């Protein structure tokens, strides 16, 4: 099962490396990884998307909590949460393809952020399934390049990750 693990850790050199090393040493796969500073400049928030049984996720959480730099660990998928991902996709857009791509981007609430004679660069934000559906909806042969951030998540309502 897919899990979104949110980790609050000290914002210092080597902290990210130790977390990634923990996953690697134990053979756990990281599907996506995002890291950014929080409202407290001394802390970073890491979002790890991984897969595994409940037992595996429990082991990952326990191992993460043992790292000195880790302040708090939460499996967001245990409760209500919001997940988003950003995708930039550059597509070939010539002739009648241009209007079709524009319509498809509009349907998926994407924005065309760069236009050249032969290409569109489209920005989409949403759940992984939405971004995957957009890729499925367009002609794959028109895709020139794709960049995705990976998942980021936050608990709903009063559920927060703070010290």
Language-model-detected regions and their locations in the chain:
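Long, contiguous binding/interaction regions
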Residues: 1-45, 49-163
